[in-house]
Amino acid sequence: MMHAQADKKPDEKLDSRQQIIEAAAQCFMLKGLEKATIDDIADVLGSTKGRVYHHFRSKNAIYFAVHRQAMQFCFDAVGPVLELSIPYSEKLEAMAVAHARVMMDTLPYQRSIRLGVEIYLRGSTTEAERAVLTELINQRNDYEELYRDVLNAGVAEGSLCVPSVKIAGRVMMGALNGLVDWYRVRPEQSDADRDLIATDLARTIVGGMTA
């Protein structure tokens, strides 16, 4: 008789893996990367550690998966904006709105990876894990490059004016990512409330960059 695990369909295995990633994001957000344990993740799932270890060999591996998913949320949110045929100042603001919304909508992921790469770089990691960390840093840099490209295009177009695109990009990402440090989910908060927060933040940032 085959084990039940062997009978699982590919999509069921994917769902199980995704559930672990989501539970880990919650644990990392609440307890921090260094204090959260596999036991904590299993508790959130209401399962045993065995289920977690079936998909991930270590807590580091889970963190890497959380980080990849967090960044994918960002790419998915901003991608459609990049296709819009609008002035680059408007595009930059729309990108900022999309980023701010994804920070709020996927808060456990985004807060759990805040400075996470730097924490792991300071810690004890294997050569293979350091290679993954480099990959994650490159992924983050690729995302930030999307904003620098729009900033450069906006300056060339004349709709944006900044002394340094490099510094403007860092200031912008710092302000947007910093949202996870002060934003708190409230039961009475509506989707429109989140839109307003995202729009106000984006306009505050980009407003100082328009020509």
Where is each model-derived feature located?
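Alpha-helical structural segments
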Residues: 15-26, 30, 44, 61-84, ...
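Helix-turn-helix
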Residues: 2, 8, 19, 23, ...
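Amphipathic alpha-helical packing segments from all-alpha helical-bundle domains
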Residues: 72-75, 123-156, 167-170, 196
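Short acidic/histidine-centered micro-motifs embedded in hydrophobic/aromatic stretches
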Residues: 95-98, 115-119, 171, 175
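Amphipathic alpha-helical segments used for helix-helix packing
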Residues: 105-131
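Helix-turn-helix/winged-helix DNA-binding modules
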Residues: 30-33, 54, 83, 152, ...
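Secondary-structure edge/capping motif, primarily at the C-terminal ends of alpha-helices
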Residues: 81, 85, 117-124, 183-187
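C-terminal peripheral helix-coil segments that are non-catalytic and often amphipathic
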Residues: 1-7, 98-102, 141-156, 173-211
